[in-house]
Amino acid sequence: MRQLFLFVVLLCGVTYGYAQGNLGKTVSVNMTRQPISAVLDAIEHQGNFHFSYIREIVHADSVVSVRANNKTVKQVLDQLFQGSIAYKETGGQLLLQPNREKWFFVSGHITDGSTGQPLHNASVYESVQLISTMTNDQGFYRLRLRERDKEKPMPVMLTVSKELYKDTIMMVSGGYDQEISASIKPAVAITLGIVDVNQYSRVGETWLGKVFLTSKQRYQSLNLSRFFADQPYQSSFLPGLGTHGKLSSQVVNKISLNFIGGYSAGLNGVEISGAFNIDQKDVKYAQFASLFNVVGGKMEGVQLSGLHNQVMDSVKGFQASGFSNMTAKGYEGVQLAGIFNVSTGETNGLGAAGVVNVYWKDNRGAMLAGIGNMTRAKENGAQVAGVFNVAEVMKGAQVAGVVNVADTAEGAQVGVVNTVRVLKGVQVGVVNYADSSDGYSIGVISIVRRGYHQLLVYNTELLPFNLAFKSGNRKLYSLIIGGASFMEGSKAYSFGYGIGKSFKDYSVEITEQNLYLGSWETIGTMARLQTSWNKEIGRNARVFLGPALTFYFSNNDAQVAGYKTRLPGPYGAIKMNDNLQFWVGWHVGFSFF
């Protein structure tokens, strides 16, 4: 009996010593800014064993600080190397080696659960490691996975996704190569309202998406439209060749660096590319590319590109490109382009382009363009262009080097030609046209289709025969004037322009006319203030008469035979100085239409 007891005690002691080993020994290490080699020497001394390692592999000269009281050797080494070194006990030594990752392969076939037919372009992925692949035309897939726990293999969850099919999950044992197949069922068809089921795969349908993304990458985005992950950073050479591999299109990053181009789910930080960035979802806060940026969601922050920016939702912030900007749901902020800006949503802010701005919905702010601006809805602000401006409803100012066009103008139109259907503001130009007017038109020719159109034939104290065309409305109308005296020895000709305002039974007008007296060198200028009482004498016919005050300026008194020598004629003028004289006269005549 005594011998049996001694045997059991001896066996337990051996078992305890074996279980403890060198990694299980307890040590205390408190060292500040010491080389790793010194820390290992201290552990060796306390544990009564030896390390075996290559100095370069463990970075023996690196300076570290360690605080470990009554910890196992393994715990101290884990703290020291953070999983980068593997430990192996051999006799009385503890080998330190590089920690090589373990990989295993999973393969199989994916078939249609209803027909049994193989499914082509189905996505198979692991959501933690962000590793994915797609089935070939026989429905076969092969996936290389990393073993997460080297001491105890853990099961891995794979997901099979395909557009119009239900997602299917496969549990895979870790640690060894294996085959596993699955049949997935089509999604149940249901009737819904109008929804954008593939709202985050739209970038693949753009021209740029079709050119720079492969068909497999576009299929992947369709299959995984419900799966997205967040990661702190990524880098890539081209779409699919980077940190997140084939799943890069489903990852939202905080920092994204693309050597040539990248394809990501979105951004919540900074993205820089040597050529292009393509993001399926929203982008915040800064995006830079030498060529172009394409965003499937909203853009908030700063977006700069050398050629083109395209946002398939809205922009809030600053957007600039060397060639063009396009936004589907408008912008709020500043939009600058070397050639053109296009927005199909409501806009608020400044839009400036070297050639043209085209906005399809309401705009609040300013539009500046070298050639033209177009707002297909309401413009609440200013349109300034070198050639033309177009707006449906203008509540602000249109300023163009040639022509302004609007359906309704409640502000100001300034250009060579201004045209509007309903005028409730002011037009200033050489030619103004309005279908109907409750505003003011100031120009050489101002036509209101449903306003004044009158032909005047009348006599004045200066010229017996005068013609004038009056157009506009009661608030303000314009006059184009011509007059003549054909009497031998008293010839004279005049031409000019004027504006006037009509009241119930009378009108007030100011005109400016040039008076030709036989020589263009002696031509004078008349400024005339006149008022007239008018009376209707028939349908579309009125008689008018009234006084006039005329100021005449001429810096040359040379006389030409056959032309007037005395102004106004029947009586003399009152001279104010050598160049300026005035007189009081009249005008009387008829108006038609």
Stretches with model-predicted labels:
Residues 435-438, 474-476, 529-593:
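Predominantly the C-terminal beta-signal and adjacent terminal strand-loop region
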Residues 257-259, 416, 428-430, 444, ...:
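Residues on the lipid-exposed face of transmembrane beta-strands in outer-membrane beta-barrel proteins
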Residues 92-101, 174-199:
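Extracellular beta-sheet/turn segments enriched in Thr/Pro/Gly and aliphatic residues
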Residues 129-144:
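Short, acidic Ser/Thr/Gly-rich low-complexity loop/linker segments typical of extracellular
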Residues 20-42, 53-77, 98-100:
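Short acidic/polar beta-strand-loop edge motifs in secreted extracellular
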Residues 261-263, 276-278, 292-294, 308-310, ...:
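Transmembrane beta-strands of outer-membrane beta-barrel pores
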Residues 81-86, 150-172, 186-188:
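A short, solvent-exposed loop/turn motif at the edges and junctions
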Residues 109-120:
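Structural motif
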